[in-house]
Regions:
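Acidic/histidine-enriched, glycine/proline-rich intrinsically disordered or flexible terminal extensions
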Residues: 202-217
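Short, flexible loop/turn segments with low-complexity composition
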Residues: 83-90, 196-206
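Residue-level recognition of oxygen-bearing side chains
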Residues: 69, 181, 194
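GST-like fold's C-terminal all-alpha helical module
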Residues: 97-191
Length: 217
């Protein structure tokens, strides 16, 4: 199996979900190693000492330690749905929207999700801080079905798992929140075959376990 890249992943991690979606759509096959974050296998830490997932170890031994690098790599090999088939100025706009997600929205999301760990402010205050970004997404989605056009892009896939996390913090609140287009977009992704296929459960990997090919054939 030395000729197949290795993916260290954690099922519910939004960064890992975006990577698995891109890997699955590209068809670039990997050996999936499901990780328990509280008990990381030494092989992961040897491959990438910073200890976050997702991580890909390529066949030549080089390591990708950032989810977006994994997306870029597999889509550069195969991008059958044209997720990155956009003009360079649009790709730059996508990169900005993703960066805002990964930097500020993610921070507000964590504070909202784990509000009990951040007693300085109320859960509602943390949720309100998520609004500027979510409204930006809502504005885009109220004029087109996906963030940058009629069809799915790299940005939709990179951002969707985080909006999903937001929606799950208080599902009742989200169901009546002022984000109808965002809800619709989220619902289409969350019930789509691609997302469902990448959420399959795998047992945590340990040295000596048989390799699990992902996407499975
Ligand atoms: N910038 C990284 C972030 C990855 C990340 O933070 N992953 C979380 C899980 S969602 C993690 O592995 N945290 C380490 C831990 O909880 O020990 C990426 O894009 O891949």
């Amino acid at each position: 199996m030395n000729d197949v890249p290795i993916l260290y992943s954690f099922r519910r991690c939004p960064y890992a979900i975006r990577s698995r979606m891109a890997i699955a759509v590209s068809g670039v096959q990997m050996q999936l190693r499901e990780v328990v974050l509280k008990n990381k296998p030494p092989e992961l830490l040897l491959t990438s000492p910073k200890g976050t997932v997702p991580v890909v170890r390529r066949v030549d031994g080089s390591v990708l330690e950032q989810s977006l690098d994994i997306l870029d790599w597999v889509l550069s090999i195969s991008d059958p749905a044209g997720w990155k088939a956009y003009p360079s100025d649009v790709l730059a706009e996508m990169a900005n929207l993703i960066e805002e997600n990964d930097v500020s929205f993610k921070q507000h999301l964590d504070q909202y999700k784990y509000a009990d760990r951040y007693p300085d402010e109320s859960k509602e205050t943390y949720r309100a801080r998520c609004h500027t970004y979510l409204q930006k997404l809502e504005d885009r989605l109220s004029v087109q079905p996906h963030l940058f056009s009629e069809r799915v892009s790299y940005a939709d896939v990179a951002i969707f798992p985080f909006v999903r996390q937001f929606s799950k913090v208080d599902e009742q609140w989200f169901a009546q929140a002022p984000y109808p287009a965002l809800r619709n977009w989220l619902g289409r992704f969350a019930t789509g075959d691609l997302f469902i296929s990448v959420m399959k459960k795998y047992k945590p990997w340990r040295q000596g376990n048989p390799s699990m090919l992902f996407p499975s054939i």
